[in-house]
Amino acid sequence: GGQQQRVAIARSLCMNPQVMLFDEPTSALDPEMISEVLDAMIGLAEQGMTMICVTHEMGFARKVADQVVFMDGGQIIEQAPPSKFFANPNNERTKLFLSQILSH
């Protein structure tokens, strides 16, 4: 689970990438393992690693992202800094998504 994700991140770092891409890195993990992977990614962000991350982990996105891009049906619906995206989204679809995700 989480250890495999961390090993995959470490292997990727061996290639000295300028950008790392993550596609739902926590989706298949047990809840207890999610924080381990997110902590590793937060560490990368703190070291200045550029990351493009597809995630439903809204707390992580709010904390780490410079920009949040919300997509629906393969289209960009909204793009904004986290402070604006989470506090005052423009698009109704974004508002609906956030109300459903952040209500729990």
Task: Give a label for each model feature.
Residues 9:
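Hydrophobic anchor residue at the start of the ABC signature
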Residues 15:
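Conserved signature/switch motifs of ABC ATPase nucleotide-binding domains
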Residues 20-23:
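Catalytic Walker B motif of ABC-type/P-loop ATPase nucleotide-binding domains
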Residues 31-33:
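Helix N-cap at the start of a conserved alpha-helix in ABC-type nucleotide-binding domains
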Residues 35-47:
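Helical segment within the ABC ATPase nucleotide-binding domain
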Residues 55-56:
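H-loop/switch region of ABC-family ATPase nucleotide-binding domains
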Residues 61-63:
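A short, surface-exposed alpha-helical micro-motif characterized by mixed small hydrophobic
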